[in-house]
Each structure stands twice: as C-alpha cells, then as structure tokens.
C-alpha cells in the first residue's frame, strides 16, 4: 500500500528526514512514535504530498508518486496524477480543520461533491452512515462551534472516510484534546483497525500503539532507528534512544 524508500527532506539548513524507508501492507496498522522534532509529522505530510521530499521514492498502491531523476533529485509525476494517487489516502490532523460555516453533514459531503463530482443525493446517505459509525448522527445539522474537541475529531475522521480512502494517515489525532475526550477518538480508530483499514498513526498514546498497532516505527533525528512488532518493541526495545524514550513516557 505504501512503499517509501530513502526519503530526504530539508527545511533550509535543517535536515528533517535522513534516508527514511517505510513499507506498509494492506490492512496493517503502523504506529510512528518518537520525541518531538524527530520528523514523524513531516514524514506523514511527505507521504500525502503536503510537503515535497528532496530525494527518495514513494509508491502508493504500486503507483509511483515520486522518484529520483538521473541527478538523484526527487521528481514528481504530473499534478493530475498526484491528485489521483493521493486521493486514495485520508488524513486526520491534530486540530480538526473543519469548515466552521458548514454543518457537520456539509463538512462530510463537500469533498466528495467538489473533488469526486458526486451528486448530493448519492453522498448524503453514505455521510449519514459514517456519522452513525462515529456516534454523531444526532449532530449532523450542528455547526462545529457547538461540538466538543472529541466530537470535532470524530467528524474529521468521518470526513476523511467520506472520500473512501484505502489508507488513513493520523497526525497525533488526540494531542489537542482534553485527556477526558481522547477515549472516544481512540475507540473510533480501534474500530477502523478492526475493519482492517490500513493506517499510519503518529501518536503519543502508547497504550493504543501497543494494543492496536501491528508494528511500531521509532523515529529519532530524522531516521527510523527501530522498527519491530508492537508488543516486542514495548517489552524489549533494542535501541538505546527508544529505551530512554519509553522510560519517560510509560
């Protein structure tokens, strides 16, 4: 589903990704963890073309998004191909990013109508079913300003699912929430995992990573320095930096 090889990314003089390679197969849940500033969110944004890599190769569902040219510099496919390939990935951000002037239902149907050209009468039933799935059907006509943070994030998840993605990317989806509200979002994500959705999750929720993820990738200083089965990683991390990190967060 995702095959990223030797990714490099700089912001000015700061090297953010240094030769990152990552493969995720269909139905896998991979947790991306590590200290702040290690490159986790940048990696996610590069996979979804929100940031551009300087070097490296990314394939999504077997299709090339970017590859190196003869000079070793990243060259992307055409913009239309980028849009088509990236449409297969949904992304959920830390801060929800809902349209405040749209109702909950309107937030869900906007992209399928404007991006995929769907008719309102064919997307509304699907959107309503997604709202039932995340437990917010009764809020379909509410505006985001009337929702709690946890409710907003569940709407954001439903909105991403409305585009029928093959892959879901989560960038610290609970980090902006009151601790009392994280559970409702994590339950929704657990449900997606049980339905075999392919997921890459940047998270500081270690219990979720241990219980739900198939694999854990630990990042430090722009590199994946340890990659193992989730339970094995938490029981016996091999890399010194990973051990120190877990001692602080567990």
Residue ranges and their predicted role:
Residues 102-110:
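Short coil-to-helix segment of the ABC ATPase nucleotide-binding domain corresponding to the Q-loop/switch region
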Residues 143-147, 151:
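Conserved ABC ATPase signature
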Residues 162-166:
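A short, proline-enriched helix->beta-strand linker immediately N-terminal to the Walker B motif
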Residues 168-171:
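Catalytic Walker B motif of ABC-type/P-loop ATPase nucleotide-binding domains
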């Amino acid at each position: 589903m995702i095959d990223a090889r030797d990714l490099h990314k700089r912001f000015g003089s700061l090297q953010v990704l240094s030769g990152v390679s990552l493969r995720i197969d269909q139905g896998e849940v991979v947790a991306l963890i590590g200290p702040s500033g290690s490159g986790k969110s940048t990696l996610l944004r590069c996979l979804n073309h929100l940031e551009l890599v300087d070097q490296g190769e990314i394939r999504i569902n077997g299709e090339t998004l970017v590859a190196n040219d003869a000079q070793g510099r990243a060259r992307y496919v055409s913009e239309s191909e980028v849009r088509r390939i990236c449409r297969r990935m949904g992304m959920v951000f830390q801060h929800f990013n809902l349209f405040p002037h749209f109702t909950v239902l309107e937030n869900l149907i906007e992209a399928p109508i404007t991006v995929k050209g769907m008719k309102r009468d064919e997307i509304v039933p699907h959107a309503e079913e997604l709202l039932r799935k995340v437990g917010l059907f009764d809020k379909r006509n509410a505006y985001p300003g009337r929702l709690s943070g946890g409710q907003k994030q569940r709407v954001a998840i439903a909105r991403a699912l409305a585009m029928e993605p093959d892959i879901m990317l989560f960038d610290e989806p609970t980090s902006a929430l009151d601790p009392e509200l994280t559970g409702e979002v994590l339950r929704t994500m657990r449900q997606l995992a049980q339905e075999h959705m392919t997921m890459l999750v940047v998270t500081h929720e270690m219990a979720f990573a241990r219980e739900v993820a198939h694999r854990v990738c630990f990042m430090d200083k722009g590199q994946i320095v340890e990659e193992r089965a989730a339970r094995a990683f938490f029981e016996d991390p091999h890399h010194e930096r990973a051990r120190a990190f877990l001692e602080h967060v567990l």
